[in-house]
Amino acid sequence: MKILFLESHPMWLYGLPNGFREAGHTVMISGPVSRENITEMIDEFKPDLIVSMGWTPEHSREKQAWIRNATKKVNIPLVYWATEDPLHTQNFTIPLIKKMKPDFVFTVTPSLCKTYESMGIKAAHLDFAFHESIHHQIKPLAKYSCDIAVVANAYPNFLEEHPEVFRSSSLKTLIRPLIRKGIRIDFWGRNWEKMSKYIGREIPRNWIHGYLDYTEAYKVYSSAKIIIGLQNCESQLTQRTYEILGSGGFLLTSDTPAVRGKFKPGRDLIVSSSPKETLEKVKYYLNHDSERKKIQINGKKAVKNDSYRHRAERMLEVLKSRGIIRNLGETIHYVDVLKEKYVIHHVTPGETLSIIASKYNVSLQQLMELNHFKSDQIYAGQIIKIREKLFRNINNKLF
């Protein structure tokens, strides 16, 4: 099958699209979406299935309308994977579904399937996973070696607006007791310097390492003795749960029904339900290397069937059984397809269409016609076609 992913965010590009590719399907990744290039991608690639997922720059209300209009003109199923559920179901997922009108919705929250079905949208559960080419075990690296690590953004503003969310409880159980006791945690992620209100004291600046690229996280998971993994909900698992275990990390997480439903605490990972338990288990496992390493091995085994290839296969099984699609490939980026036929330009911050036209010695009108623009408004990251490439025939003549 040919699957078109309307996505540009690295966190999602390395997951489900690669899962489909490894399952033998041909995948095109759109990159930044525009009103014009959606139609061109569909016309040139001729996908059997179109997938959108998450909450990224490709999900502005304007782009939702573009996607809906382009996909409804063709008889190709549009699927949306709601990865922001349940925290943003009301303020994001449901408005998106009403605007974009997908043919099927997958959600990471099982209980929401009935909600979407009641709206007249076919739905099913699809959990997070990990991709083995990104999250795999390596030998510990000195740069990331430490006793305890957290790889996550802090989200202080979200916690301020939503103090009732389970993430707040997870934070108070797993992180706050250690910080208050002066036990070092090394943090990778944004805004941990703003968390004193929720932790009870300032985190020392030399414990905070800032943003870590998504593709580098496995190095921390493989190098730290203990990885603390916060949970956002009691009824479902975070994506990092799978990624940490897939990378061979030793995971300390919240004691929730979802964790116990999937894993066996003390065998695959360790859990805590109180600050006291957190302190006790951290002290114990930092001093019992052999037990810790045994749990690491078991944790990796526990997610062997939770790769994104498994999720891709599951998605297709559901779509076939629900009548959305009928009964081996490579990953293709739309920009590479364009390069075969056109001279292209990636818009950088501050550039205007007039500046680009002057740079390539073409008229503004030519650029607007070639790219089907109705105005000269462009944005950083956009791919602009400049002109068709010239080719030589067998008589060495340009055509």
Curated annotation (Swiss-Prot):
Keywords: Sporulation. It holds the Pfam family LysM. It is found in: Spore wall. SUPFAM superfamilies: LysM domain, UDP-Glycosyltransferase/glycogen phosphorylase. LysM domains are thought to be involved in peptidoglycan binding. Expression of ykvP is regulated by SigK and dependent on GerE. Inactivation of the ykvP gene does not affect vegetative growth, spore resistance to heat, chloroform and lysozyme, or spore germination in the presence of L-alanine. This is Spore protein YkvP. The lineage of its organism: Bacteria, Bacillati, Bacillota, Bacilli, Bacillales.
